[in-house]
């Protein structure tokens, strides 16, 4: 991705798991992102979508798991995850859409 057309094309979905839920207290959020996006694009997209200040972005490429199917073996698609740390004093991101 050479240029950012829409920040919502970069941030695909939040990761909701026990680990990511525990990290919410530390202002750390995990998102599934576009595989071709870089840390700078992810930071700009998070700041535009959620109106927060990002302190750091770490990324991890996850290989798709090999799964059995009726006809043999298949493979889940590989994903890229971004671990986003918000700056101190930044408001939290509402991932669950609860009324304020």
UniProtKB/Swiss-Prot annotation:
Statement: the UniProt record of this protein carries the keyword Acetylation: no
InterPro entries hit by this protein: Nucleotide-bd_a/b_plait_sf, Ribosomal_uL23-like, Ribosomal_uL23/eL15/eS24_sf, Ribosomal_uL23_CS
Sequence intervals crossing the membrane: none
Cellular component per GO, a single term: ribonucleoprotein complex
Pfam annotation, one family: Ribosomal_L23
GO annotation terms (biological process): translation
Sorted UniProt keywords: Ribonucleoprotein, Ribosomal protein, RNA-binding, rRNA-binding
Molecular function (Gene Ontology), one example: rRNA binding
Family: Belongs to the universal ribosomal protein uL23 family.
HAMAP family cross-referenced by the UniProt entry: Ribosomal_uL23_B (MF_01369_B)
Subunit structure: Part of the 50S ribosomal subunit. Contacts protein L29, and trigger factor when it is bound to the ribosome.
UniProt function note: One of the early assembly proteins it binds 23S rRNA. One of the proteins that surrounds the polypeptide exit tunnel on the outside of the ribosome. Forms the main docking site for trigger factor binding to the ribosome.
Protein known as: Large ribosomal subunit protein uL23
Lineage: Bacteria, Bacillati, Actinomycetota, Actinomycetes, Mycobacteriales
Gene name, Swiss-Prot/TrEMBL: rplW
